Each structure stands twice: as C-alpha cells, then as structure tokens.
C-alpha cells in the first residue's frame, strides 16, 4: 500500500496493545481461566486478578490515545487517525472482539451450529486481523479497493488461524502449545473441530 515506517509504528503499537488486552482478559478465571500463556504464567497468575483486569483495561484504552496523538503530531493524517480510531473501537467492541467473547462465554457447554461458530471466529480473531490490515491501509493512504482486499484477506486468515488453533488444542503437545492440551473441551467450549 505504500506509506512510511513512522506512520505504521503507532498503528502497530496500538493494535498490539489491543491484542494484549484481549489475551489478558481471555486468560482470567471468569473467561477461559488459563494459567499459562505462551508457555509462561498468565498475567493474573503473576500479578493477581485485579491487577490483570486493570492492566487489560489500560491496554484497551491506550490504543485510541496513541492513534489520536499520532494524528495530532502529524505522524498520521488527522482524518486517517479518526478513521483508524473508529475502526479500532468497532473491531474491539460489541460488534467485534467483545461481542465474539460474549458468544463464546454464553455458549460454554452448548453444541453450536457451524454458522454461529464461524460468526464467533469472525468477531474475535477475524476482527483483530481485519483491524491490523485495514488500519495499515488507512494509515498508508490506500484506497477503498485495497482496504476491501485487505479486509477479505484478514477474514480468511482469521478463520484459518482459529481452525488451526482448534486442531492444535486437540493434537499438539503442551510444550508446543504453551498451555494444557484439550483446554477447550475441558472448559466446555464448542469449537470448529468438535
């Protein structure tokens, strides 16, 4: 799409913070209750649940601030910064990652039809990857056609990632996976594989 590294950096940092927020909250006992993340103790195991919740909350808020500051400082075109901030909040919110997590948590132990599983994946992983791809395009000044192509790519990549993650949860060893194998089934999560 073009663009300069100085333009990409605040966008990449904002997206990574949002992703980290989602992982911290996802590991909490009230969500997936995972004690391990990438082979290391999860945030709430190291710092306690309250601090993990607050760290996640802070990381959910910082991306908008980073993008706004990049627009104010001229690192990103101000209108592009507004568009990225709107997209960031849409993809993180009830129509994106948080909405997908609601579907996930509200349906533990229930057999879900394929279309609901795919919608959940689209809203969780797909929304984050769509944000990555489209925000980069917007920051670089790419047109609507490239943004649409990036969005379509992100959707397919998100679905592929989630299906691979489901397969690994059943077939991988704990060392490779970085968390206990079979944790989805153990917690009553219905996945594409199950």
Question: How would you label these PLM feature ranges?
Answer:
Residues 1-194:
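All-alpha prenyltransferase/terpene-synthase fold signal
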């Amino acid at each position: 799409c073009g663009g300069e590294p100085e333009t990409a950096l605040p966008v990449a940092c904002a997206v990574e913070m949002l992703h980290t927020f989602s992982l911290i909250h996802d590991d909490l006992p009230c969500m997936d209750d995972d004690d391990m993340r990438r082979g290391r103790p999860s945030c709430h195991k190291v710092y306690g649940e309250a601090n993990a919740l607050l760290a996640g909350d802070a990381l959910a808020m910082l991306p908008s601030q980073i993008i706004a500051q990049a627009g104010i400082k001229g690192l990103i075109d101000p209108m592009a910064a507004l568009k990225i901030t709107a997209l960031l909040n849409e993809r993180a919110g009830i129509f994106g990652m948080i909405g997908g997590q609601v579907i996930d948590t509200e349906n533990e132990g229930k057999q879900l039809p394929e279309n609901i599983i795919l919608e959940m994946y689209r809203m969780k992983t797909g929304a984050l990857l769509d944000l990555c791809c489209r925000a980069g395009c917007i920051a670089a000044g790419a047109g609507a056609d490239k943004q649409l192509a990036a969005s379509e790519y992100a959707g397919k990549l998100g679905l592929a990632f989630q299906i691979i993650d489901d397969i690994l949860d059943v077939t991988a060893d704990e060392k490779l996976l970085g968390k206990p194998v079979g944790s989805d089934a153990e917690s009553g999560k219905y996945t594409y594989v199950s």
